[in-house]
Amino acid sequence: MQRKECVAMLLAGGQGSRLGVLTKKLAKPAVPFGGRYRIIDFTLSNCNNSGFDTVGVLTQYQPLALNTYIGIGSHWDLDRKNGGVTVLPPFVKEMGGEWYKGTANAIYQNIEFVDQYKPKYILILSGDHIYKMDYSLMLDFHKEKQADATIAVIEVPWQEASGFGIMNTAKDARIVEFEEKPKVPRSNLASMGVYIFNWELLKAYLEEDERNPRSSNDFGKNIIPLMLEAGQRMFAYPFKGYWRDVGTIESLWQANMDLLLENPKLDLNDQKWRIYSVTPHQPPQYVAPSARVNCSLINEGCMVFGNVYHSILFPGVDIGKGSTIRESVILSNVKIGKNVIVERAIVGVETIIEDNCHIGCKENSCPEDCSRITVVEGNIIVPTGSFIKKDCQLVGKAG
């Protein structure tokens, strides 16, 4: 096996329970985003664009759709004879096996996979964030600082800092303290869930952590505090670009809406840093003469006879006459009948919304009444004349 300087390990087994019905049958990294992508596309594309050609993808919760989607990695130019993408679910060894117990345990269980490439460094990534980042620049920073570990950080609003792992740093960016979701944060430098470690050193810490029966087997709760306590050289790598944790319905909806700004901070048209995906084969979209479309993304295979304002339509969506879609995300192959109103909502794949339905905010509601997002599960039928109020999750019948 050809030696690799750095191996990337992408943690993609999370359930994303705060996304409700959107992750009922999908792992969080497989959730659709931006009209034609899935969340994991951003991390995989970052790897390719950064020149990292060996990526292990660790899956666990509802892995079928994600495994099928990734395949051999060809859509991200990661189908290589030496390296490329390898999907790594939990497995059974001679001495038994178990589910991944935490982020650190997931890497521990795949030490043999990493070791076969004899890397000097390991890049650990989360598969459930939306951002574009050149990991090679972070690796250069890691080498320049002669670091044992480097953690990518971004400044977050102070009122949100308690929801993240927070770094306190010296003037030279060396990390002097790490707090996991502190109640009263002393800094607003949040961990992005992107780490570079010297592999042999990390491996020793993973093995030590595994021997501790009281450990949560987690990087934020266990590995990073242990390394700090031991005085290892740990540095914070500042990231200035767009980054969003889409772990809630509201944050996922907002990240989609961010794409519709006149000058979006996340530019999907950047030819120098393309985001790759598995693209469905659909005919061109059609917008009828009577339709009105404003500030929206309309994808292949869509048939629009109604009105679409500030919304994103995934491939194969039909919008009937007299219907209005406003500030919403409509996933693939949804069929919306006539005289339907959908406002500030996310509608799941292949759902049918029959005529005269109203989903989300009522017209002329005050902004405070429309601050929460309505979600409709995929593969269900919403009967004629239904009213689904704001801040609801509409779930189909079991079975």
From Swiss-Prot:
Keyword Nucleotidyltransferase: yes
Binding site for alpha-D-glucose 1-phosphate: Y100, G165, E180, K181, S191
Entry keyword Nucleotide-binding: yes
Alphabetized InterPro entries for the sequence: ADP-Glc_PPase, ADP_Glu_pyroP_CS, GlgC_bac, GlmU/GlgC-like_hexapep, NTP_transferase_dom, Nucleotide-diphossugar_trans, Trimer_LpxA-like_sf
Enzymatic reactions: alpha-D-glucose 1-phosphate + ATP + H(+) = ADP-alpha-D-glucose + diphosphate
GO molecular function terms attached to this record: ATP binding; glucose-1-phosphate adenylyltransferase activity
Highest taxon listed in the record's lineage: Bacteria
UniProt EC number: 2.7.7.27
BP GO terms, sorted: glycogen biosynthetic process
Pathway annotation from the record: Glycan biosynthesis; glycogen biosynthesis
Keyword terms, alphabetized: ATP-binding, Carbohydrate metabolism, Glycogen biosynthesis, Glycogen metabolism, Nucleotide-binding, Nucleotidyltransferase, Transferase
Similarity remark: Belongs to the bacterial/plant glucose-1-phosphate adenylyltransferase family.
Oligomeric form and interacting partners: Homotetramer.
Function summary: Involved in the biosynthesis of ADP-glucose, a building block required for the elongation reactions to produce glycogen. Catalyzes the reaction between ATP and alpha-D-glucose 1-phosphate (G1P) to produce pyrophosphate and ADP-Glc.
HAMAP family assigned to the protein according to its UniProt record, in alphabetical order: GlgC
Protein name, as recorded: Glucose-1-phosphate adenylyltransferase
Organism encoding this protein: Desulforamulus reducens (strain ATCC BAA-1160 / DSM 100696 / MI-1) (Desulfotomaculum reducens)
Name of the coding gene: glgC
